[in-house]
């Protein structure tokens, strides 16, 4: 069963320097029907103006990853990490027992467009850690590349939860099929462009809850970039 969450139905926070679309309830946006899905708690589609960003702020007991679509995002944290995240890079910060970080647009002239995604961890109070990896467009072209997993399989980043995240690029006749293990949920998010999921047309910003499906086929893309989350079969996130 596929349940569509239209891009136009998302929450919107427009602060001038920041324009953020919220797939699920976040900050001042509250929707009782959209409180997350399985262990997936947040998908924020953020556009940050040149030279602007989020000052240092704390997190704990959350798996937070950033996926840059355009521009460059500068990250600093209390673990001593300093990095710049660009398209193709995936950054995963496991907040664990507590960490503070800042994120700013690295450019003084161009905006940055990125997704920030939160996954609830399976254990509380773990040691904080930071990971970053680059996945080339070639690895994602016409296929679903594993970018996050519990065990770091195929060069993916390790997440502290029974969740897997795939990224793919699709255009024209390119297609890929993901076989889900039995009794799993999934969530599909179209980061940009348009694509079909099992024949259902999707546009940029659309999301789909997936239940009781074994095969997910992405096809007929137009400059599409897609994230697919393989998740535990539960409706709402539960903090550890």
Language model region names:
Residues 1-240:
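Jelly-roll (double-stranded beta-helix
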